Amino acid sequence: MASIILINFSETDTLHLGSVNDHIMPRIGYTILSIIMALSSTFGIILNMVVIIVTVRYKQLRQPLNYALVNLAVADLGCPVFGGLLTAVTNAMGYFSLGRVGCVLEGFAVAFFGIAGLCSVAVIAVDRYMVVCRPLGAVMFQTKHALAGVVFSWVWSFIWNTPPLFGWGSYQLEGVMTSCAPNWYRRDPVNVSYILCYFMLCFALPFATIIFSYMHLLHTLWQVAKLQVADSGSTAKVEVQVARMVVIMVMAFLLTWLPYAAFALTVIIDSNIYINPVIGTIPAYLAKSSTVFNPIIYIFMNRQFRDYALPCLLCGKNPWAAKEGRDSDTNTLTTTVSKNTSVSPL
């Protein structure tokens, strides 16, 4: 039978060595997953490295409001380096070959970088809310505020991903049993209490923060857009461009993470649910693919990052370079605009 009860994963599953799990999925399925993860990890590493390198290299990008973006790129780099590449290898082998310790370390690393990335998106949303929606936000937002957001994302992720290392919760194989994650399936009170706290504070809270911040941001941008005629259109144009980029960035992140969060919540609520392990693997792989989308959005929707990153990727060429007004537009994006709201590069 193709379906299994997810809660039946045991500690010995993570020690299973030397044979392909073809009772879960045919060998060709593992090969396909290995190729997908190898490609996703490679692109994720390259693109996030470009974001980090161009930010470090060019002073124009080293602004407080860009710190959270670079922090997200670091988190998105950690996921494929410490998780994606390993998953590609284990899928190529058809079973998890790293033993119990390897499972714990891989599960911790992916969860640590993944939640740090999710918190970084929440921090980005709060940053934008402060600058766009709050009076004098750009004046008040300083380096110390940006650094506080960066530190918070890592500390928060560390706090909530280390308890399984000490007995409150655990890391266990998931899906087709070639990668590890927090153990959503064990039903004892200690593990359930951890998973509920983890879900509320590492998924629900960042999601709520993102939604609250961007709903207010979009409302403010809509109000500013109505002043386009009176304000020659320049401010409203920049505001709309910024809104489009941040909304697409957040939606891409949520669309990749929400299925995983919903899957985990379903398992927590209904302990007897039957789910095909292949279907159970899809949300996890969607979540891991988010590390590719964010740098693409930075490069192709943010003129500042695009002007510096594309030449780095394309050997000095930038086919999207603006023919006219490049300097004036860049200067507009690197300074605050209008009396009502302020925008910085995203």
UniProtKB/Swiss-Prot annotation:
Cystine pairs: C103-C180
Highest taxon of source: Eukaryota
Pfam families: 7tm_1 (PF00001)
Residues the record lists as N6-(retinylidene)lysine modifications: K288
Membrane topology, record value: Multi-pass membrane protein
Cytoplasmic side: 55-66, 127-145, 222-244, 302-346
Transmembrane portions of the chain: 30-54, 67-91, 107-126, 146-169, 194-221, 245-268, 277-301
Low complexity bias: start-end ranges: 330-346
Keywords on record: Chromophore, Disulfide bond, G-protein coupled receptor, Glycoprotein, Lipoprotein, Membrane, Palmitate, Phosphoprotein, Photoreceptor protein, Receptor, Retinal protein, Sensory transduction, Transducer, Transmembrane, Transmembrane helix
Location, primary (coarse class): membrane
Gene Ontology CC annotation, any one: membrane
PANTHER family in alphabetical order: OPSIN
Family listed: Belongs to the G-protein coupled receptor 1 family. Opsin subfamily.
Protein name: Parapinopsin
Species name: Ictalurus punctatus
